[in-house]
């Protein structure tokens, strides 16, 4: 009561404005816009409009669009792309010298494996001849499994640094990345890296680039990304050689479609036209989108609309990667940066890579960009939670990772042995392995992954065609005989580069894997480029590991889709007491059946607990048994209390035990623990 009286006296003594503001406060709060995001995010978005521009933003706003340069670094695995990116960031003052290694390799799996998995971007400011230039760098993956990342990166680039290791020369993925960049019309700058190595032969590497790619090597730059030697010569070359616009040829049929740019990269005065290049998930901000602005400009608070979904969003924050997320008040035409919406996207599927956005009200004035062609999954696995209660957590984790990697396909499926799970499609086995690592590291998911398999094409006798990715959908024996005309499997054209001394072993390996030789070239007296057409099923069966073993680690491999070819394809099943275990079934070529069948039954026997009755483990194709193992039952000693001379009683007890086992085997279910499947399916 005393407290209430004191408050009343204070209010009566206070200025009228104070009391009025206090009485109005609930009304203001009740009618304020409600944003479902963190208070930190709201404070950040509100302060963007009021706080003065930072020195960085003042420098960027003073740079005209003609002084923008967007470029990427493409090369074979381990040729030094990420290390060179570090040196360029240090040279432009974006990071402190020696402050970090592989700054743009942000994922744990990238640092563990020492490879780039995700294309990462960073903006830099570089002063050349007294003028500031805004440079946008993309560090791309080198492995063939992540070529979709490389392809998407070209959408925001006008040129590329083609990097070659001076000690190794041109490798398989150097060739693949060159043709991909060349097809998109990118301006290519030859760069020879690791010239400080004792084994470096920069002149030989230059000669290879000149002969293989017909590049003008007079302007090639010799650098050592590790020591920083000559790195300062790269950026002036980028500014002089790479235009502020990109050319995308009209007849290109690569993964990227046309972006039809033959004029400067954009006009700030036109209505907003924005391309969604990538996206990822943040636990506080939700879905964050990496975008390229083609026309117009975008600020926090504006409302935009998606051409793909028709959904409208309010922009919560815009910024650039410098190298981490750095908020800005505006993104202009020609820039690449990030945005997130407030409120955010409700579902990860709303962020469609290749989608075009514009301001609400300008939909009819803006022509949407063509976007990206979806890459085709080539390798499929089934994923199940170790604990069935964690299915929803696994689903959320997969959806968040797919937001960051749209080349993965996801379908729900169920197994009698392992319960509810997912059928996942990937571009290759390394792609699959990296995804599995990210699920475990970033989301703490405990999962069971089946061995990788490839799709097959069923041609029915009525002329219809069907692509099968799951063994559960493979036709049964009767259907195969009566309704199926032909079964085809996918082939790839593999390009292998290696020293000439290993030629015999490599040819032997390819022939053993049902390969057909297409060409053989010597691009130096000691280096060979060998092209083979191989079944994709053989390629995913650790072909690269066998190739490395045959060449002592000196070989490199690249591949592309070739064609479907007829093959003797069957479904191999594992039977436990004549009941099929659906989680283990695989679609394989008949030549692999005996080896895999024996391997399966031997390995599965090690992980099945003994029962009170005999457990028979078999590998079968249709009704034909390929291999068999038996798990002996526990045996009770029924003769323990019997006198040695009572032969008839002895015989009677043994017969009774035998009959009991027969009945138990007929009605008893084999209990197979989850951990048995986990151990069996482990690599």
Swiss-Prot record:
One of its GO terms (molecular function) is GTP binding. The keyword Ubl conjugation does not apply. The keyword GTP-binding applies. Belongs to the TRAFAC class translation factor GTPase superfamily. Classic translation factor GTPase family. LepA subfamily. PANTHER family: TRANSLATION FACTOR GUF1, MITOCHONDRIAL, TRANSLATION FACTOR GUF1-RELATED. Promotes mitochondrial protein synthesis. May act as a fidelity factor of the translation reaction, by catalyzing a one-codon backward translocation of tRNAs on improperly translocated ribosomes. Binds to mitochondrial ribosomes in a GTP-dependent manner. This is Translation factor guf1, mitochondrial. The gene is guf1.
């Amino acid at each position: 009561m005393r407290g209430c009286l004191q408050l009343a006296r204070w209010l009566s003594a206070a200025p009228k404005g104070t009391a009025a503001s206090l009485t109005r406060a609930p009304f203001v709060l009740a009618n304020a816009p409600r944003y479902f995001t963190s208070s930190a995010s709201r404070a950040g978005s509100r302060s963007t409009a009021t706080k003065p521009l930072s020195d960085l933003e003042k420098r960027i706003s003073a740079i005209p669009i003609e002084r923008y340069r967007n470029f990427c670094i493409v090369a074979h695995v381990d040729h030094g792309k990420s290390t060179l990116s570090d040196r360029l960031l240090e040279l432009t003052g974006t990071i402190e010298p020696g402050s970090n290694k592989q700054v743009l390799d942000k994922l744990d799996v990238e640092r563990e494996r020492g490879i780039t998995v995700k294309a990462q971007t960073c903006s830099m400011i570089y002063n050349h001849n007294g003028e500031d230039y805004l440079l946008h760098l993309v560090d791309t993956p080198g492995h063939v499994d992540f070529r979709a990342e490389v392809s998407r990166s070209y959408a925001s680039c006008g040129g590329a640094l083609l990097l070659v290791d001076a000690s190794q020369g041109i490798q398989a993925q150097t060739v693949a990345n060159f043709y991909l960049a060349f097809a998109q019309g990118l301006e290519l700058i030859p760069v020879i890296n690791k010239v400080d190595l004792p084994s470096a032969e920069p002149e030989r590497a230059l000669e290879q680039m000149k002969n293989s790619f017909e590049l003008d090597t007079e302007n090639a730059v010799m650098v050592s990304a590790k020591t920083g030697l000559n790195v300062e010569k790269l950026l002036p070359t980028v500014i002089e050689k790479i235009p502020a616009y990109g050319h995308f040829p009209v007849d290109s049929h690569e993964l990227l479609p046309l972006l039809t740019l033959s004029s400067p990269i954009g006009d700030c005065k036109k209505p907003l036209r924005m391309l969604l290049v990538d996206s990822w998930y943040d636990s506080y901000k939700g879905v964050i989108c990496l975008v390229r602005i083609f026309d117009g400009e975008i600020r926090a608070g504006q409302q935009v609309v998606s051409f793909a979904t028709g959904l409208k969003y309010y922009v919560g924050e815009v910024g650039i990667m410098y190298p981490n997320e750095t908020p800005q008040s505006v993104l202009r035409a020609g820039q690449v940066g990030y945005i997130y919406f407030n409120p955010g996207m409700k579902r990860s599927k709303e962020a469609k890579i290749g989608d075009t956005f514009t301001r609400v009200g300008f939909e009819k004035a803006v022509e949407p960009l063509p976007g990206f062609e979806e890459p085709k999954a080539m390798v499929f696995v089934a994923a199940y939670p170790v604990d069935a209660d964690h299915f929803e957590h696994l689903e959320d984790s997969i959806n968040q990772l797919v937001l960051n990697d749209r080349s993965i396909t996801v379908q729900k499926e169920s197994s009698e042995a392992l319960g509810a799970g997912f059928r996942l499609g990937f571009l290759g086995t390394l792609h699959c392995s990296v995804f599995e690592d990210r699920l475990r590291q970033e989301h703490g998911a405990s999962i069971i992954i089946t061995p990788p398999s490839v799709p097959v094409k069923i041609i029915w006798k009525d002329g219809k065609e069907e692509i099968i990715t799951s063994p559960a959908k493979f036709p049964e024996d009767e259907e195969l005989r009566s309704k199926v005309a032909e079964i085809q499997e996918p082939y790839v054209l593999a390009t292998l580069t290696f020293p000439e001394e290993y030629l015999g072993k490599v040819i032997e390996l390819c022939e053993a894997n049902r390969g057909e030789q297409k060409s053989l070239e010597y691009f130096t007296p000691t280096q060979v480029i060998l092209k083979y057409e191989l079944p994709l099923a053989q390629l995913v069966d650790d072909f690269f590991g066998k190739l490395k073993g045959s060449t002592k680690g000196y070989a490199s491999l690249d591949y592309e889709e070739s064609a479907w070819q007829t093959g003797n394809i069957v479904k191999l099943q594992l039977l436990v007491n004549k009941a099929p275990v659906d989680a283990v079934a695989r679609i394989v070529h008949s030549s692999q059946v005996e080896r895999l069948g024996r391997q399966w039954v031997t390995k599965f026997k090690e992980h099945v607990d003994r029962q009170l009755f005999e457990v028979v483990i078999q590998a079968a194709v249709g009704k034909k048994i390929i291999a068999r193992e038996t798990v002996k039952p526990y045996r009770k000693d029924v003769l323990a209390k019997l006198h040695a001379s009572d032969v008839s009683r002895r015989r009677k007890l043994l017969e009774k035990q035998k009959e009991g086992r027969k009945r138990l085997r007929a009605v008893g279910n084999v209990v197979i623990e989850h951990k048995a499947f986990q151990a069996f399916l482990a690599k």
